[in-house]
Amino acid sequence: MAEETGALPSRTDFSAWYNEVIRRADIMDVRYPVKGLYVWYPFGFALRNHTYTLLRSLLNRDHEETLFPLLIPETEFMKEAEHIKGFEDEVYWVTHGGLSPLDVKLALRPTSETAIYPMYALWVRSHADLPLKLYQVVNTFRYETKHTRPLIRLREITSFMESHTVHTDWDDANKQVEYELGLATEFYRDLGVPIIISRRPDWDKFPGADFTMAIDAVMPDGRTLQIGTVHHLGDHFSTTYNITYEDVNGEQKLASQTCFGISERCIAAIIAVHGDDKGLVLPATVAPTQVVIIPIIVGKRGDEIMAAVEKLESELKAAGLRVKTDARDMRPGAKYYHWELHGVPLRVELGPRDLDNNQLVCANRLGVKTTIPRENAADSVKRLLDEAHDQILEKAEDHLSSHLKTVKTVDECNQSLEENIVIVHWCGEKACADKLEELTNSSLLGTGVRSKYVVDDEGPCIVCGKPGKTALVGRSY
């Protein structure tokens, strides 16, 4: 965590920039001696905690938090054949307790359906028990064989929020799907991250789901990052695990279910979507430090300035802001570099001239400078933080809209995919999707697109020319 100076790689080389900013901005240390497992630095973990506090505050309106075990007996894990087929080559198995072989192998959860649903079968008895809406934030393990990358592709996902709900029927579960998509939209708006929602094609849906709705963000290089999913499970798992209830007529009915997940990819999205060549650009909603105060010590007025700084810090903290004063014995420029690298939303400078004029000089992370009166500083600072959030959201929206391209031919699709998500029409046939993916080295992301920048309409399929509907094509992390 030693301070480094010098410029970061340009963000136009996104991979190099991302790896370097993760390290130099104290997010994660990648040197742990197991591939795909990383260590949170305290600063990165604080960012993670503020982000998940925000997520929990939204979930707690409609869910209750719980915690299920990490280990899943093979007997329960193997009950759901279709589900397991989607994970079987990624599972870590515990085969011994000490030196003794276990009678039943234990899986480290890749996801928790097979841990949670046997318990739901015990808990749900009557329609009065429904809906049941629980979530947990846990670590999960998947034996990734692809190239691993901090926060994006991991073998240990350290912060997986998974919601699991149970409902009386398919329609009520579908309302929950819509609710959770709305929750995710609000969450990412609070992070300043614009998203695109679409329905994944059937061959790419969650194993065992009726359908999957996916939430994608656009990275600086035009690739997509899946940063959330909501799955309508129908009665698939309730059939396997016998999750039934007695309805108002005294009849036994199978329940319908949903699940919803967001991992620490939400942190990757914050870093990637907002960052610049100076480092992180953090939204004030989750920044570990929202305001840094820089004393400008000139001449013999140091004690007077520091007294004013301490008073200002106390006032801002009393207003509920996360504030630090950087009183280190170093040039102001070096301090600016440090706090810009770490993405602090607002810098407040206080020197002799500001003291004499009863003012504060403020600069937000995008470089917008403002002078505010010292009186009622907390109100002014909060307003500037709100304005800074609006500015980074607008910048991110501009990036998203500029990286969406509508095309009519496969050749146009191929050319546009270098830096964009491509909007096409597709007939719905897997053969056409397979051909398009093969010719363009891309993935058909989904249909039923929800974005203010995408018109969900009809047109001739880009491959066969038959009637089709709007679909997204992209290259993904």
UniProtKB/Swiss-Prot annotation:
GO biological process, one term: prolyl-tRNA aminoacylation
Swiss-Prot/TrEMBL catalytic activity: tRNA(Pro) + L-proline + ATP = L-prolyl-tRNA(Pro) + AMP + diphosphate
InterPro entries in the record: aa-tRNA-synt_IIb, aa-tRNA-synth_II, aa-tRNA-synth_II/BPL/LPL, Anticodon-bd, Anticodon-bd_dom_sf, Pro-tRNA-ligase_IIa, Pro-tRNA-ligase_IIa_arc-type, Pro-tRNA_ligase_II_C
GO cellular component annotations of the record: aminoacyl-tRNA synthetase multienzyme complex; cytoplasm
Keyword field contains Aminoacyl-tRNA synthetase: yes
Keywords for this protein: Aminoacyl-tRNA synthetase, ATP-binding, Cytoplasm, Ligase, Nucleotide-binding, Protein biosynthesis
NCBIfam families linked: proS_fam_I
Function field: Catalyzes the attachment of proline to tRNA(Pro) in a two-step reaction: proline is first activated by ATP to form Pro-AMP and then transferred to the acceptor end of tRNA(Pro).
Assembly and binders: Homodimer.
Name assigned to this protein: Proline--tRNA ligase
Naturally occurring in which organism (per UniProt): Methanocorpusculum labreanum (strain ATCC 43576 / DSM 4855 / Z)
Name of the coding gene: proS
